[in-house]
């Protein structure tokens, strides 16, 4: 089933995007920061969410990992 129609998969994809964008911004800030509008601006926004809500995103990733490993 597509990740767009399965809520659990959609949350996994969003969390992975947030974590990936925040990590890439820490390695290559100019790559993410030069595009703040349009479609590429979505990745800048995801990186900002990952930086500002870092403890909450980390907790959500741990909970998601637990559910993927032991619950599904």
From Swiss-Prot:
Glycans are attached at residue 35. Residues 72 are cytoplasmic. It holds the Pfam family DUF1242. One of its GO terms (cellular component) is Golgi membrane. It is a single-pass type I membrane protein. It is found in: Golgi apparatus membrane; Endoplasmic reticulum membrane. InterPro entries: KISH_domain (IPR051523), Ksh1 (IPR009653). One of its GO terms (biological process) is intracellular transport. Keywords: Endoplasmic reticulum, Glycoprotein, Golgi apparatus, Membrane, Signal, Transmembrane, Transmembrane helix. Residues 27-53 are extracellular. Residues 1-26 form the signal peptide. The chain crosses the membrane at residues 54-71. Belongs to the KISH family. Involved in the early part of the secretory pathway. Kish means 'small' in Hungarian. This is Protein kish. The gene is ksh.
């Amino acid at each position: 089933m597509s990740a767009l129609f399965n809520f659990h998969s959609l949350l996994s994809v969003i969390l992975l995007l947030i974590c990936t964008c925040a990590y890439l911004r820490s390695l290559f800030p100019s790559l993410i920061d030069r595009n703040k509008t349009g479609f590429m601006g979505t990745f800048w926004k995801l990186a900002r969410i990952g930086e500002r809500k870092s403890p909450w995103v980390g907790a959500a990733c741990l909970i998601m990992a637990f559910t993927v490993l032991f619950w599904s």
